């Protein structure tokens, strides 16, 4: 895949076009598959290396009307060779902390919210769709026109 990457936008196009991140995690309680932030990062690492890029995260705790949110910003940096300079693109996502989560202390709740917000920042940046395909709901019924 080694192409001449001129800027962060070229890198983003290449990464989005080549990123494969299947939903390999299983939720047995809800009987569905999913991917988490770590899965996305694992799939991204070879592509980041190939395009001379890296990801940096910044988290911010925000309070809105007695609710606490974690605001995660993912920044894709493209290193311009031999110049010690980079160009970047950012994407931000929010996740709300639940007031109580059974079996978790406060730091675990914040950590889980951070991971969730980071996952959705990565989804936005790299055009990862977490929804079911529209055909999933079709049930082999013909479409009707109204």
Walk through the language-model features, giving the residues of each.
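Polyanion-binding surfaces on beta-sheet-dominated domains and ring/shell assemblies
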Residues: 1-146
């Amino acid at each position: 895949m080694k192409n001449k990457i001129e800027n962060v936008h070229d890198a983003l196009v290449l990464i989005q076009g080549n990123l494969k991140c299947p939903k390999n995690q299983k939720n047995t309680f809800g009987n569905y598959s999913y991917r988490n932030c770590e899965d996305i990062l694992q799939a991204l690492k070879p592509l980041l290396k190939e395009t001379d890029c890296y990801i940096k995260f910044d988290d911010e705790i925000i309070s809105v009307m007695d609710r606490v949110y974690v605001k995660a910003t993912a920044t894709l940096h493209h290193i311009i060779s031999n110049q010690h300079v980079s160009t970047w693109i950012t994407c931000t996502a929010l996740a709300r902390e639940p007031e109580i989560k059974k079996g978790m202390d406060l730091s675990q709740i914040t950590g889980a919210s951070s991971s969730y917000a980071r996952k959705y920042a990565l989804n936005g940046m790299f055009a990862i769709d977490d929804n079911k395909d529209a055909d999933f709901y079709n049930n082999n019924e013909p479409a009707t026109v109204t």
